[in-house]
Amino acid sequence: LKKNDFNYSLKNCLKDINQDLVFYGGKNLLSKVIIFFLNISFKLIFWYRISRYRYLKSKMARKALIFIKYRLYVLGGNEIDYRAKLGKEIKFAHPSGVIIGAGVVIEDKVTIFQQTTFGSHGHKDEPKSYPTIKQGAIIYSGAKVIGGITVHENAVIGANSVVLIDVPKNSTAVGIPAKIIE
């Protein structure tokens, strides 16, 4: 990961956080304050954005990431690596047990349910490879999306599926291991 991958300034970070507040229903100052303090889904993406900014800022600032990682874990056992790349309007429908690894890319308007994992294949003799989740995908409860695969636009991953293959655009993958059914 290179420092300029996101070119993520404080201004961009705050802009993204404000867009997240609006996405989660913040229409005015009062509703934004309520969402900021009470909406766990927002807090998950908020802490990710702060950690991403801190990671790209400097080595010294990275020490703050220990605290941020702890906060995410306390908020329902979630772990989002600051090296992952998350787009805008990511919806965490039930933010509990969401694990997102270092090289994962999740594009805009993706919905993620509880107890989902996005990570590398874990083969010790091979370089790590991580999934890419394209715009509009929905990942249901308990799904595991593993390895250097792509879940394409508007694809659906069924509950408790283990996805080890690419999922085509506008299709559904279910099962262990997952098979394409549409």
Regions found by a protein language model. Give the residues of each.
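Terminal amphipathic alpha-helical/low-complexity segments used for targeting or macromolecular assembly
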Residues: 1-76
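Left-handed beta-helix
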Residues: 76, 82, 87-88, 93-96, ...
